[in-house]
Amino acid sequence: MPKREITFTVKLPIRSVWSFMIDRKEVGCLFPGCKGVTILNDLDSIWMIKMSLGPFSRTIEMHAHTEEMVTNERIVWTATHEHLLTSGIITFRKVSEEETEITYHIEGHVTGHFTFLQDIVIAEKLGEVTRGFMKAIKERLEWTASSEP
């Protein structure tokens, strides 16, 4: 199963980072290709994502489920769509009173025919999406930090 992980720090208290990261609509709008997030309940949501691979693109519904949420520590989730399974964990570590380290780990897997070949493609796409998503999150958090009094 292809995996990607990115770690970065932001100059914000952990409580501010946590508050932002648990807002699925706010975070969802930063995910590359996300066209909207529908909150179903405290643990479940549907993310409409436009996936592109070369000249082909398709909008899919990813059904996301929060498996575990420990305040100011971690969020564990899974998301599925037909033959696509993803899972991830976001961990938060207090570096200082005003700085937080965020680690984003994601795994993706395609089921069905030609799984091995599809996983090769998914591995590349996962890296691209992860870098874009974490860059957008870091920029938004840094903007938030610069806007605080």
Where are these regions (language model features)?
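Short, surface-exposed coil-to-beta transition loops
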Residues: 3-5, 59-63, 84-89
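Hydrophobic pocket/interface hotspot
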Residues: 17-21, 27, 45-47, 66, ...
